């Protein structure tokens, strides 16, 4: 069977080595005679898995000791709610920086749940010569007392990524669902990091939360026990039955990433993949991208065909060539190639070859 390269934005492809290992031990995990999906989450064997998973993630991301690592239910949207409920209390105030679809959704959820708390927002995307560009505000010039400032460094729908570190006098809460472990960051700059697993960590249904200890002292109005960070810390992410298979696969992804040299190593590969694809897009007028070079996403490359009537044919022929899930988000249309950690360089080479041949045929 010919190779299939899955460019889906999420759930995304997983490393082949991880999938093969899961396949091999699906019916007999760790010599237990049963699947990891069937074993008790409170068994010593599974608890050992969770401890190793946390240790590996801490090592990969250089997470300081004063941060808790939580493995929680749900995805990013669940964390939109959890952040508000855990940190704002009755009279808190928060600032949301809006750079695209997902930060806008986080803002909408915060406004819905805030009650008497105050939610402020700033749009940080401007048009520069017709292209989307991020302009980070000087937060030190804002006269306010915020519990936190929320932002999303990578917008999967819009193909926008913020590479500059945010400088804030208030705790930073960041949605890293699509960039976690794709490049190195300084975790100590953040009050809380959350990430849905289904892009760079594992299958959907699991979220990773990395929270600084002092954040847990903020006033809380959280009503849902499974979204209570304090309860999750107290019970080692096992207040109730966790998504065990997703946790197992996340552990295997962490181990795989360590085996290939860690985040520093994969970051170089990710940069190479993105540069190769953007070079193809920029090399002729057949394709176009609507983001300034400094804010082009490395994880989610969005592009349009100059002749949109060819979109259907492009997707049809790409599918035949083994290049799947390239259709852009319904909000923006066009195409989108998601280049998460598990996407091999060979997949991008195959996509570029196809795009060049398609352009030559229909130009």
Swiss-Prot record:
Residues noted as binding pyridoxal 5'-phosphate in the record, renumbered to the chain: 76-77, 102, 156, 175, 198, 240-241
Catalytic activity: O-phospho-L-serine + 2-oxoglutarate = 3-phosphooxypyruvate + L-glutamate; 4-(phosphooxy)-L-threonine + 2-oxoglutarate = (R)-3-hydroxy-2-oxo-4-phosphooxybutanoate + L-glutamate
GO cellular component labels: cytoplasm
SUPFAM superfamilies cross-referenced by the UniProt entry: PLP-dependent transferases
One Pfam family linked to the record: Aminotran_5
GO BP of this protein: L-serine biosynthetic process; pyridoxine biosynthetic process
Localization terms from the record: Cytoplasm
EC number of this enzyme: 2.6.1.52
Subunit note: Homodimer.
Protein name: Phosphoserine aminotransferase
Protein species of origin: Shewanella sp. (strain W3-18-1)
């Amino acid at each position: 069977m010919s190779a299939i390269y899955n460019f889906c934005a999420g759930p995304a492809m997983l490393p082949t080595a991880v999938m093969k290992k899961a396949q091999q031990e699906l019916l007999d995990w760790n010599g237990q005679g049963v699947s990891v999906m069937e074993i008790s989450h409170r068994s010593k064997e599974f608890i050992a898995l969770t401890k190793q998973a946390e240790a590996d993630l801490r090592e990969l991301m250089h997470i300081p000791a004063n941060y808790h690592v939580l493995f929680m239910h749900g995805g990013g949207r669940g964390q939109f709610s959890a952040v508000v409920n855990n940190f704002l209390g009755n009279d808190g105030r928060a600032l949301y920086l809006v750079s695209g679809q997902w930060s806008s959704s986080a803002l909408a959820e915060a406004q819905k749940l805030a009650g008497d708390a105050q939610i402020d927002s700033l749009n940080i995307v401007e048009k520069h010569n017709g292209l989307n560009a991020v302009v980070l505000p000087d937060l030190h010039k804002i006269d306010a007392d915020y519990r936190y400032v929320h932002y999303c460094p990578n917008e999967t729908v819009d193909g926008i990524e913020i590479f500059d570190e945010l400088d804030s006098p208030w705790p930073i809460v960041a949605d890293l669902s699509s960039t976690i472990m794709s490049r190195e960051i300084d975790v100590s700059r953040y009050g809380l990091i959350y990430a849905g697993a289904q892009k760079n960590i594992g299958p959907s249904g699991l979220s990773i939360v990395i929270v600084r200890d002092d954040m847990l002292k903020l006033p809380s109005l959280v009503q849902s026990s499974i979204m209570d960070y304090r309860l999750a810390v107290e019970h080692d992410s096992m207040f109730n039955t966790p998504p065990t298979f997703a946790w197992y696969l996340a552990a295997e992804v962490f181990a795989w990433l360590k085996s290939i040299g860690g985040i520093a190593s994969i970051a170089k590969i990710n940069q190479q993949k993105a540069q190769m694809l953007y070079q193809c897009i920029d090399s002729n007028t057949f394709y176009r991208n609507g983001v300034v070079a400094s804010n082009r996403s490395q994880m989610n490359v969005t592009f349009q065909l100059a002749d949109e009537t060819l979109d259907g044919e492009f997707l049809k022929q790409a599918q035949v060539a083994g290049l799947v899930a390239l259709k852009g988000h319904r909000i923006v249309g066009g195409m989108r190639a998601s280049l998460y950690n598990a996407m091999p360089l060979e997949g991008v080479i195959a996509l570029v070859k196809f795009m060049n041949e398609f352009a030559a045929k229909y130009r």
